[in-house]
């Protein structure tokens, strides 16, 4: 679940046409959202308010062990008009879950938001924790349409030198993204890059035309990235690489994502497979293995959305609709006392205006077949108007719209709650999370159970509930 400040940050990225999925740190975000989701501990209340289109504030209070809380402020130089409160926000935007990746996401956002002029916008965020004197801050400064500077600071008396600061210089291009990172903690230097390989739009259309009736996967995106770290004070290196394959079925539109991550220094290998089985369900599996210790672990997780009662009742109460062409055919046809259906002549039924209706000139009267000459096309032009489009063009249009239709159905669905469950065989752990609406609040509750290694009995490791309200 996103906090309100995290939600505003994502709205800032969307308004300024910044693609978060093209960053190396988010290459495994889909599997992490389904397997490593946090469980609330104790009782927590989060109240947020957006005073203007440029500023917002948030107040958090919790009673875990002791009463503590925080106060946060956010300012954006660009107006955030695409934000919603907890009453109107969709669960798809409030919860981190499956993401449908696109190769040219920044170009798509630019077409959807042509008002943005790629100016040097910025976002300022700060949070103060109490009791105590812990502070955190974040600054996002856009340098160019594809370059931004991100600075994160933490001030805590329990940390070495009372705090730390991390600076990110990010270059986010559709084909290649790069990050230069510096942290004051042990003078850490880092470099990240992510390269995307995918079929262009022309290749996609060509592949669809070559596979008329064979269901296949296309619109694929292959991302390969790596990160290199070096701590100057401790002289410790770090290296990891990752691979991501995302595609959608041209026949059903359902997306799937596969990731593979490797750390050669530690000998850790991780592979994950995530698929959206339906509009309201997603399944994920992850396998970890260490080549040095031969330790392995299998993790499974899924999420199921529940439709709102109003949406279900409306869909159940609405009878199946009859197309206008079909209803007009039924109304224009007549039935005699014997039950024989007589098709009227074309002067009554204007078949030229119904390209989807094919009227057979062969009719049956008194158990004999007769050809009605008035239903035969008189000229070639009339025949072309009545003739349906070729099968190949129908298949092409269906393939082109299957992916967008499924994506629109997911985004426009009205869900009232979601259930997440994940388990790990090696860790012997089970997590269950529920998030839904209660009046104008978003309620999150969950439990984490582990198996005691000594008594082999299940124990409650974490349990809590959280209430969020934003206006």
Swiss-Prot record:
Compositional bias (Polar residues): 325-338
Keyword Cytoplasm in record: no
UniProt GO cellular component terms: ERMES complex; SAM complex
Any Pfam family the entry gives: MDM10
GO biological process assignments: establishment of mitochondrion localization; mitochondrial genome maintenance; mitochondrial outer membrane translocase complex assembly; mitochondrion-endoplasmic reticulum membrane tethering; phospholipid transport; protein insertion into mitochondrial outer membrane
Top-rank taxon, per record: Eukaryota
UniProt-listed InterPro entries: Mdm10
Record membrane topology: Multi-pass membrane protein
Annotated region (Disordered), positions in chain: 313-338
Compartments reported by the entry: Mitochondrion outer membrane
Primary location recorded for the protein, binned into one broad class: mitochondrion
Keyword Transmembrane: yes
Keywords, comma-separated and alphabetical: Membrane, Mitochondrion, Mitochondrion outer membrane, Transmembrane, Transmembrane beta strand
UniProt similarity note: Belongs to the MDM10 family.
Domain notes: Lacks alpha-helical transmembrane segments, suggesting that it resides in the membrane via beta-sheet conformations similar to those predicted for other outer membrane proteins and porin.
Function: Component of the ERMES/MDM complex, which serves as a molecular tether to connect the endoplasmic reticulum and mitochondria. Components of this complex are involved in the control of mitochondrial shape and protein biogenesis and may function in phospholipid exchange. MDM10 is involved in the late assembly steps of the general translocase of the mitochondrial outer membrane (TOM complex). Functions in the TOM40-specific route of the assembly of outer membrane beta-barrel proteins, including the association of TOM40 with the receptor TOM22 and small TOM proteins.
Subunit structure: Component of the ER-mitochondria encounter structure (ERMES) or MDM complex, composed of MMM1, MDM10, MDM12 and MDM34. Associates with the mitochondrial outer membrane sorting assembly machinery SAM(core) complex.
Protein name: Mitochondrial distribution and morphology protein 10
Natural source organism: Debaryomyces hansenii (strain ATCC 36239 / CBS 767 / BCRC 21394 / JCM 1990 / NBRC 0083 / IGC 2968) (Yeast)
